[in-house]
């Protein structure tokens, strides 16, 4: 919104300083600042409003240290996160950019699914929340929208350079280029690190690229959003981890959306993707601002309203910058938490069937509860998980050069 206003003032009145809004770095910095400001100024008021509506967390006694003290803590704090994402993005991003539109839709879409889940838990006194099938339907529907848009929208392109022998390359090696719609993505750590989903689909059957790609998008969005949801089990873990991931994806978006940096790093140039930095900055600011109130001891929980939205937009952002195959590393905390639940449940069922009694791999799942049961304090678990998250982020950024 402000981008267009200041562009108009610059063109119409030659307003001094208006041109600064042309710079992605400035708008990203302002988006992060405003996002943090909204959280710090309005956060307490939002928490008070939630408390007045008696929207408190109901706690099931799992025998964890300090667990029952959290009973009644306001939940649905994800509304604060969503507000802190949407307002700065609308103010500072180009609202005609297809990637920004997709991410705003994803934020609201998954936020609504999470809100309905929290609403049923709190007001209908149903601990199961929204039925799993409805969550899946919502995530699959969003996956269809995102997948088809990324595949067929004319603004979603990569730059292909024409070499002297007539061959094509995404690495800048000539001054002759065309921006083309493509299903290319990148594979981390490989020298020739480009993968065309179209070439995989040809091994299965002809003309099945759209089906394969959309299916992948659905899986990625569902897996990452559910991973963030499972990770949100102790104070500050999901918010802090998401902030680290948001910063990393913003860096990927910046270098991929800048022709000079893309050429220097020998990576795929993705026109229009630089605008994702503004959204990523707002996302990071929202997570850090939320941490002000969610760090131990938490004054508010994000609930599914926040966790599903966070995981979903992280997935969509990674798909937009064609780094979805890097997500197992970048979102390693989400992955480990998810796997710990799958392993625990599967092993319990297997041993119960084979030996007549269920056995466990971990003292409790997800993994953060295992460490709680082992006597570690919440703050220590969260801090160490953040450190691992930072290491994974650095490893992910290293793929820009290590291949």
UniProtKB/Swiss-Prot annotation:
The chain crosses the membrane at residues 30-50, 73-93, 95-115, 136-156, 210-230, 242-262, 273-293, 300-320, 325-345, 380-400. It is a multi-pass membrane protein. Its main location: membrane. It is found in: Cell inner membrane. GO terms for cellular component: plasma membrane. Pathway: Cell wall biogenesis; peptidoglycan biosynthesis. The keyword Metal-binding applies. One of its GO terms (molecular function) is phospho-N-acetylmuramoyl-pentapeptide-transferase activity. CDD domains: GT_MraY. GO terms for biological process: cell division; cell wall organization; peptidoglycan biosynthetic process; regulation of cell shape. Its cofactor is Mg(2+). Pfam families: Glycos_transf_4 (PF00953), MraY_sig1 (PF10555). Its EC number is 2.7.8.13. It catalyses: UDP-N-acetyl-alpha-D-muramoyl-L-alanyl-gamma-D-glutamyl-meso-2,6-diaminopimeloyl-D-alanyl-D-alanine + di-trans,octa-cis-undecaprenyl phosphate = di-trans,octa-cis-undecaprenyl diphospho-N-acetyl-alpha-D-muramoyl-L-alanyl-D-glutamyl-meso-2,6-diaminopimeloyl-D-alanyl-D-alanine + UMP. InterPro entries: Glycosyl_transferase_4 (IPR000715), PNAcMuramoyl-5peptid_Trfase (IPR003524), PNAcMuramoyl-5peptid_Trfase_CS (IPR018480). Keywords: Cell cycle, Cell division, Cell inner membrane, Cell membrane, Cell shape, Cell wall biogenesis/degradation, Magnesium, Membrane, Metal-binding, Peptidoglycan synthesis, Transferase, Transmembrane, Transmembrane helix. It comes from the Bacteria. The keyword Repeat does not apply. NCBIfam families: mraY (TIGR00445). Catalyzes the initial step of the lipid cycle reactions in the biosynthesis of the cell wall peptidoglycan: transfers peptidoglycan precursor phospho-MurNAc-pentapeptide from UDP-MurNAc-pentapeptide onto the lipid carrier undecaprenyl phosphate, yielding undecaprenyl-pyrophosphoryl-MurNAc-pentapeptide, known as lipid I. Belongs to the glycosyltransferase 4 family. MraY subfamily. This is Phospho-N-acetylmuramoyl-pentapeptide-transferase. It comes from Cytophaga hutchinsonii (strain ATCC 33406 / DSM 1761 / CIP 103989 / NBRC 15051 / NCIMB 9469 / D465). The gene is mraY.
